Curated annotation (Swiss-Prot):
It comes from Listeria welshimeri serovar 6b (strain ATCC 35897 / DSM 20650 / CCUG 15529 / CIP 8149 / NCTC 11857 / SLCC 5334 / V8). Bifunctional serine/threonine kinase and phosphorylase involved in the regulation of the pyruvate, phosphate dikinase (PPDK) by catalyzing its phosphorylation/dephosphorylation. One of its GO terms (molecular function) is phosphotransferase activity, phosphate group as acceptor. Belongs to the pyruvate, phosphate/water dikinase regulatory protein family. PDRP subfamily. Its EC number is 2.7.11.32, 2.7.4.27. PANTHER family: PYRUVATE, PHOSPHATE DIKINASE REGULATORY PROTEIN 1, CHLOROPLASTIC. This is Putative pyruvate, phosphate dikinase regulatory protein 1. It is an enzyme of class 2 (transferase). Disulfide bonds: none annotated.
Length: 274
């Protein structure tokens, strides 16, 4: 079998067409003479020059053009030049359109943009883990948003939930024994979200926590004095930072996260108007 010269044509990067072509050639034990990519071909005036080059080199065309007008022009021109052409997307798009009764978006590069969104989420999740519970105060400067709150205000699960939305979140516990990170005062207060909870609810949660680990009534963790002290420290800090404060009492993680996302959306809209 003669080694083929393969020309990949795409209105995006051409990675999909090249990957499929290499996979197909491997079934014949062939290494292509070369695979040349013509990427971001999004207008018909480029087509004749490309097809002429392929014809001169006795090559074949494999393409993943999603723009219908460009795809039809490429297929027609290749036939006119007698160039073998494989349309990877056209038949599939047509069949899916017929099956689902909807028109394709015809937007090149959507897989790539979806991949980028996926990897952004992965990076955000890793960031949330690395910056959980105040373990890396310097992360505050790289975060999209910072959650602050006393113990049992759902900071960690909220950080993970918001990370799934692609947001880089740091959460900082507010406890009397720990120094408040200086970095909190170096960022825009709009990036800080305080999480507060009622004394009654917090007392109940902490008492149940102690029971679950076999230490009912132990220490000061669930004492009135301790809880009053922590709530006072939080209120003072939130006031000093002039940050947005959200009451999480009796709210599910999803509900609180949704309120945070709504608040974030309002910040974005406000900044766009400035």
């Amino acid at each position: 079998m003669t080694q083929p010269a393969v020309y990949v044509v795409s209105d995006s990067t051409g990675e999909t067409a090249e990957l499929v072509t290499r996979a197909a050639l491997s079934q014949f034990g062939q290494t292509p003479k070369f695979i040349h990519r013509f990427h971001h071909v999004d207008s018909s005036h480029m087509i004749e020059e490309i097809v002429d080059l392929v014809a001169v080199n006795n090559g074949i065309i494999v393409h993943t053009i999603v723009l219908e007008s460009v795809r039809e022009e490429l297929n027609k021109t290749a036939q006119a030049f007698g160039v073998p052409i494989i349309d990877l997307f056209g038949p599939l798009l047509n069949q899916l359109e017929e099956t689902y009764k909807i028109k394709p978006l015809s937007e090149p590069g959507r897989v790539r943009s979806m991949d980028e969104a996926y990897f952004n989420k992965v990076a955000a999740i890793e960031f949330a883990v690395e910056n959980d519970d105040g373990r890396n105060p310097r992360g505050i400067l790289q975060a999209d948003y910072v959650l602050i709150g006393i113990s049992r205000t759902s900071k960690t699960p909220l950080s993970q939930y918001l990370a799934l939305k692609g947001l880089k979140i740091v959460n900082i516990p507010i406890v009397p024994e720990a120094q408040i990170p200086d970095e909190l005062f170096e960022i825009d207060p709009q990036k800080i979200i305080g999480l507060k909870i009622s004394k009654q609810k917090l007392t109940k949660i902490r008492q149940e926590r102690l029971i679950s680990i076999g230490l009912p009534g132990a220490g000061t963790y669930a004492s009135n004095q301790r809880i009053d002290e922590e709530l006072a420290i939080f209120d003072k800090l939130a006031s000093k930072l002039n940050c947005f404060v959200l009451d999480v009492t009796n709210k599910a993680i999803e509900e609180t996260a949704n309120e945070i996302l709504i608040h974030i959306g309002e910040i974005v809209d406000e900044n766009l108007e400035l």
